[in-house]
Amino acid sequence: MPPNPMHEIDTDADHPATQVEIEVVEAVAAVDAAQWDACAAPEAADGGRPYDPFTTHRFLKALEDSRSVGVGTGWQPAYLLARSGGLLIGVAPMYAKSHSQGEYIFDHSWSHAYERAGGRYYPKLQIAVPFTPATGRRFLTRQGHEAAAIQALTQGAVQVAANNGMSSVHVTFCTEEEAIAGAAMGLMHRKTQQFHWRNDDYACFDTFLSALSSRKRKTIRKERRVAQGFGGEILALTGADIQPEHWDAFWHFYQDTGARKWGTPYLTRAFFDRAQDSLRDDILLILARRDGRYVAGALNFIGRDVLFGRYWGAIEHHDCLHFEACYYQAIDFAIANGLSRVEAGAQGEHKLARGYMPVTTHSLHWIADKGFANAVAEYLDHEARAVGEEIEILTSYGPFKRTGTEDTPE
């Protein structure tokens, strides 16, 4: 994407003197880490854990330093900055995209239709965490400047796209509050769904199981027995317990899954070296070891209130080990650490039977071509209704006890 000069945006029609400067930078290292995190993770200023580990300066820098994003990847960093009176009041992890891979909010049909009509869909702008279908803030604002910064970043992204002749702007897995604010500014609000586990103040895993129907309790207990009887041990590692040898093993698992799902893994081997150096405290790594070697693993990231499940892989098949490593170990960790939610990534109706319930996820979209935008808006209206109906149906099939029904003794 061509360099975009700094420009000003008026963020308050009633007070025209309120000006915010918008700038695009092509490396997160161009922004002081403390200043970025003052917007991305103000709650962590005292050394605590950020709500969202994926928008921190250290995570985005690890993606860049490892060349998981950048030249040749189709994810070209174009971070959006908003300043008022010289103070950085907002940032957004924005990328110029030359494809639609690694986003998990699917617009392939849009791109095909756009190009069949004679348009050029790529490059487009994506405000997102690369390869990460985790929900969270996408317009990262300094406390006390939220409204002005969100408005400036939203308008700034659209202006950057328009100035550079780009087809569209996409803000994926944003918060519902951001989606509502963006829709009020003329962007299109898209609703999709994922499966999340919620912690209803459970004291332990058995307390969680007691909230389920008898049949589902029995199934989960059986799956855990089968998985834990695979002939080895399951390790839950975080912080200083994670060592380079663990990444050597996990890389093999990740490569296998990446090759089968995407053709090529999105993250490079160097990313896991960066994770060892600067991200270990943000990570929960579940590894299964048998006969002295690691045979499977699941990578999770830890937020202040949420555990985010990201990657699973294995070099041996063992019944139910996937469920144990990805879902049940995550629930154990969330309960033990007082986390309110586990996000288990994109798709997967099999998660429902294991206590992960359907929830609405949100994204925002702006398309330069008005005729095409109108067609997409009509499609999104139909899609939102279908998603709402699907969530209602799936919820009715959930594993939890029905109110007013008697449970069968075990």
Label every PLM stretch briefly.
Residues 1-410:
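N-acyltransferase acceptor-side catalytic subdomain
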